């Protein structure tokens, strides 16, 4: 009998395949599309309640659909009039791709399978959430000068129903901090409005919540069709966890000022002060996470260049007009991508318009570290690693208590002081671009135009591997040129997911996750195994591995540009075309057997060096999902020894292209080289830009010396908030006091301040 994909998606069977690559290779089992599910939409908030369609499988109208996530969380599905099945996503305490299966016989067998992308609650589109109109009013309700109506709006088409309920849910974490019994829980509290028309708008005058509900100060609203019972989510059925999730629209999570009790409304500042002091006492007993988090980059330039370890904080983004509500005076903030190892804590770094780091000791606009990383951290599921909500509980609600609802911000800043940058070490960068020109970690550059698949960098420190494929470039008229360009890059670290970025044959940029092409149409950010993946609107792809290493890939006209960023700990732990990262260029051209070539080697000798780093089928990370790739790269040679490139292109003064080339390239040798070998000014122009970007990156990543923060003397002032090499801080005393010690101190090359501590 022919093999079947029932229960077998992702496997290669005896006679056919149930893997994603089977479609382009034409080797799928006949029932591949029936059992291996395509869904739309493919992502939704971790809060659940999102209806998604199973596109490729038809079911009987009488089928009883059950959807099961992670092999244990079950939700009810249904068959629509068109015969297509739908599932409802469950409440999950994690982000990332979640495997799910579908049963059509009320849960006896689950032969169908697919994956659902669970995302951070702030990363779903606005249309999927209901909007707290004038959100500040909701979060300050009951404080002086904030009263009257509150309004909620939503997209009414999202729920196919005439009447809705609006529920209030609260979030809490119970048990002992940092212990096995520390648990996260969303709880249905009460129904705010029942059976109201689904018009897309609701206004009300809030009253303090009844009973002990008003003790919940952090939560969320949920809109559901009114034909379900209140708060319906889970029914415990024997030993099975059967969750009857229902279609829902959630609001953004927020401080529940508007439903707090009379004690809050009568004297909000006193109530908040008591809460702030209580939080401070709790923090006193918790372990110090600040010693564990990475230091901030010293300058805005470093922060924006270190893309493997830091990513834009969407709450303060220079590319979106610097709307920095929580950080007055800042123009840009970044967050450390990885949570700290033991405590799952997060780092944040903010900068002013001069590019200088803003510290909380100087300004309330300073950056504050987080006991709970805002994005959560693997393995999720338990505090302090719950995406978004753990962070709200320890770092945001407490900010409301101390800074926004009362005047005790000094208490908050004492527990969340900015880290300075004295221990920050910038990463080292290597790049490849154009008709491949390579810039190594130690700053050597060379051109290697082999055709094949090569190890760009590998490291024994974290089993990091980045591999590049080069293909023959084409002239503008379509014929093949005697040069190559980078057409695909594949990478993995330890046992992480494998990411590949490549140009397809029709020159579309594709990103593959474990051999499957993925779409960024709904989500530009993905939390994956061992890495984060980000794509900008113009297809700049960034991979951030858990070690802090980063890979950036951009495409232009069939040529890939690649940058790899490695933190200092990779020193003396790299090999491949990008060289041995150790600060010396003499050993850049090191072969697999550890012999080296002179740095003055000829292009022909460098061709030998490059060929030595060809990958083997056993260690290749690439996906071979077309006849062309199989023939040329899988069954063919990994390094095409018969392909001989142009080593020295001829510059003919009578060639009209040369005149134009000078205008485009100026004196850039790589640009000139690529124009002559590809006959394309556009390729030359992209090469020049990539070369300039690399030089700029290396410049931005130069180490900066910091002498650390200086305090003002008691009964005196200080002038200046820059603490980097060459900065001067001057001191004066209040009237009636005299200064002893240094009037001004300068940050010296040793990392120490000149002079002595002043006092008044």
Model regions and ranges:
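Conserved N-terminal submotifs of small, disulfide-stabilized extracellular modules
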Residues: 702-760
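Immunoglobulin-like IPT/TIG beta-sandwich domains and homologous Ig-like subdomains
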Residues: 45-107, 162-209
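Short, solvent-exposed loop/edge segments of extracellular or virion-exposed proteins
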Residues: 45, 434, 439-440, 708-718
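Short, disulfide-bonded extracellular cysteine-rich repeat modules
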Residues: 17, 23-36, 344-350, 413-423, ...
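Beta-strand/beta-sandwich contexts
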Residues: 36-60, 115-151
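Short edge beta-strand/loop segments characteristic of extracellular beta-sandwich folds
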Residues: 50-57, 88, 151-157, 730-734
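Extracellular, cysteine-rich, disulfide-stabilized repeat modules with beta-strand cores
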Residues: 10-12, 16, 20-30, 286-290, ...
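Von Willebrand factor type D
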Residues: 125-703
């Amino acid at each position: 009998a022919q093999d079947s994909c029932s229960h077998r998606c992702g496997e290669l069977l005896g006679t056919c395949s149930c893997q994603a690559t089977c479609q382009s290779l034409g080797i799928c089992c006949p029932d591949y599309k029936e059992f291996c599910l395509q869904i739309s939409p493919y992502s939704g908030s971790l809060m659940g309640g999102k209806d998604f369609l199973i596109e490729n499988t038809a079911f009987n109208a009488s089928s009883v659909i059950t959807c099961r996530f992670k092999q244990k969380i079950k939700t009810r599905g249904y068959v629509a009039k068109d015969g297509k099945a739908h599932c409802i996503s469950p409440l999950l305490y994690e982000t990332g791709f979640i495997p799910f299966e579908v049963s059509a016989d009320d849960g006896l067998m689950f032969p169908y399978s697919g994956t659902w992308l669970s995302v951070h609650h702030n990363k779903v589109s606005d249309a999927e959430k209901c909007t707290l109109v004038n959100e500040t009013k909701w979060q300050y309700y009951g404080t002086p000068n904030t009263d009257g109506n509150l309004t909620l709006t939503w997209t009414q088409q999202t729920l196919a129903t005439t009447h809705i309920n609006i529920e209030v849910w609260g979030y809490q974490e119970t048990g002992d901090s940092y212990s096995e019994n520390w648990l996260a829980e969303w709880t249905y509290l009460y129904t705010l409005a029942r059976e109201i028309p689904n018009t897309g708008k609701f206004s009300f005058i809030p009253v303090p919540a009844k009973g002990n509900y008003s003790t919940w100060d952090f939560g969320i609203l949920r809109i559901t069709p009114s034909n379900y019972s209140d708060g319906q989510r889970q029914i415990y059925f024997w030993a099975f966890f059967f969750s009857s999730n229902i279609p829902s629209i959630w609001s953004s999570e927020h401080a529940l000022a508007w439903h707090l009790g009379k004690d809050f409304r009568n004297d909000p500042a006193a109530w908040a002060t008591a809460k702030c002091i209580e939080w401070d006492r709790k923090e006193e007993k918790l372990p110090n996470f600040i010693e564990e988090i990475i230091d901030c980059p010293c300058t805005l330039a470093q922060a924006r260049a270190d893309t493997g370890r830091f990513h834009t904080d969407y709450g303060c983004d220079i590319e979106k007009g610097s709307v920095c509500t929580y950080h007055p005076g800042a123009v840009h903030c970044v967050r450390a991508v990885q949570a700290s190892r033991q405590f799952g804590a997060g780092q944040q770094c903010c900068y002013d318009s001069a590019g200088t780091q803003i510290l909380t000791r100087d300004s309330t606009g300073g950056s504050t570290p987080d006991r709970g990383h805002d994005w959560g951290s693997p393995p999720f599921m338990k505090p302090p690693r719950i995406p978004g909500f753990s962070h709200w509980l320890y770092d945001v609600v407490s900010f409301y208590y101390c800074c926004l609802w009362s005047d005790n911000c000094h208490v908050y800043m004492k527990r969340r002081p900015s880290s300075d940058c004295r221990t920050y070490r910038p990463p080292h960068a290597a790049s490849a671009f154009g008709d491949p020109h390579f810039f190594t970690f130690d700053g050597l550059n060379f051109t290697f135009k082999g055709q094949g698949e090569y190890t760009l960098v590998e490291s024994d420190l974290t089993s990091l591997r980045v591999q590049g494929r080069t293909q023959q470039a084409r002239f503008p008229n379509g014929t093949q040129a005697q040069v190559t360009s980078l057409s695909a890059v594949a990478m993995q670290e330890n046992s992480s997911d494998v990411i590949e970025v490549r140009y397809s044959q029709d020159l579309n940029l594709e990103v593959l996750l474990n051999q499957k092409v993925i779409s960024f149409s709904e989500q530009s950010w993905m939390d994956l195994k061992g890495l984060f993946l980000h794509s900008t609107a113009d297809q700049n792809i960034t991979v951030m591995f858990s070690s802090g290493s980063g890979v950036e890939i951009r495409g232009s006209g069939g040529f890939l540009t690649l940058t790899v960023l490695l933190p200092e700990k990779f020193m003396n732990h790299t090999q491949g075309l990008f060289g041995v990262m150790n600060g010396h260029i003499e050993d850049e051209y090191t072969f697999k057997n550890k012999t080296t070539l002179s740095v003055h080697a000829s292009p022909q000798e460098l061709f030998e060096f490059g060929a030595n780093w060809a990958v083997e089928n056993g260690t290749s990370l690439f996906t071979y999902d077309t006849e062309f790739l199989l023939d040329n790269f899988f069954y063919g040679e990994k390094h095409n020894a018969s392909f001989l490139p142009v080593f020295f292109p001829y510059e003919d003064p009578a060639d009209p292209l040369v005149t134009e080339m000078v205008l485009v390239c100026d004196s850039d040798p790589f640009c000139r080289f690529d124009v002559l070998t590809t006959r394309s000014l556009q390729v030359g122009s992209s090469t020049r830009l990539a070369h300039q970007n690399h030089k700029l990156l290396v410049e931005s990543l130069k180490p900066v010396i910091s002498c650390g923060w200086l305090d003002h003397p008691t009964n005196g002032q200080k002038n200046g908030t820059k603490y980097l090499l060459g900065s001067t801080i001057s001191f004066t005393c209040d009237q009636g006091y005299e200064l002893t010690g240094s009037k001004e101190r300068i940050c010296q090359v040793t990392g120490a301040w000149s002079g002595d501590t002043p006092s008044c």
